[in-house]
Regions:
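Nucleotide donor/acceptor-binding cores
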Residues: 4-6, 119, 149
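Alpha-helical elements of Rossmann-like donor-binding domains used by nucleotide-donor carbohydrate transfer enzymes
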Residues: 19, 45, 61, 70, ...
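Conserved acidic residues
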Residues: 33, 53, 67-69
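Short, conserved SAM-binding/catalytic segment
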Residues: 46-52, 113-117
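Conserved SAM-binding strand-loop segment of SAM-dependent methyltransferases
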Residues: 52-59
Length: 194
């Protein structure tokens, strides 16, 4: 008997979904079943690229789909709490891109919804799996480099020099503290550092 696969609904078809969806596409126990984006044409294109059966422009439509077991929320930060709560209340498991919310009050509301629903809630932090970070952790554990007392990191993100281009129009919300929670340095890229 074939093992049942978890059916994922991707919420947000922006640039980060290119990276996030690789794991689902490569995992035999997962299937991208639907894509939701406010831009229906983008949702349809992504659905075609990833072999999803459905594309939606409305989160409510995706959450009403009985063939979706879990959602991966890849939207701007200010939308995370309301979308996660709606998904949990609809009986879906939820994966949230970092940062999960903009405030402790939002986090309390999301975790309360997860407890009430009995569904799984996870926050995805991809940097902990990056090979350089894994190697540094290994070297520290082995005592090979002594005890770190400070770390200096130079990064470039969303720019061609970093090997990953993000359109300026897709970056605009990251400059608005009410939508991103504190600016790109603190709440977007900075989140990885903690």
């Amino acid at each position: 008997m074939a093992e049942e696969r978890i059916r994922i609904g991707i919420v947000g078809g922006g640039r980060i979904s290119d990276l996030q969806c690789l794991g689902y596409l490569e995992h035999p126990g997962a299937e991208i079943a639907a894509v939701c984006d406010v831009d229906l044409v983008l949702a349809q294109r992504r659905a075609h690229e990833w072999g999803a059966r459905s594309a939606y422009a409305s989160l409510d439509e995706l959450l009403a789909d009985p063939d979706i077991d879990a959602v991966d929320i890849l939207t701007p930060h200010h939308l995370h709490a309301s979308q996660a709560i709606a998904a949990l209340e609809a009986g879906k498991h939820v994966s949230l891109q970092k940062p999960p919310v903009l405030s402790l009050a939002e986090w309390d509301a999301v975790t309360a919804a997860a407890r009430r629903s009995g569904r799984t809630l996870r926050v995805f932090e991809n940097f902990m799996y990056y090979p350089p970070h894994q190697k540094a952790k290994e070297l520290i554990a082995q005592g090979a480099i002594g005890e770190p007392i400070s770390v200096r990191v130079k990064t470039a993100a969303g720019h061609p020099s970093a090997g990953w281009t993000v359109a300026p129009s897709s970056q605009a919300w990251r400059m608005d503290p009410s939508r991103c929670g504190g600016g790109p340095t603190t709440f977007d890229h900075g989140y990885h550092c903690f």
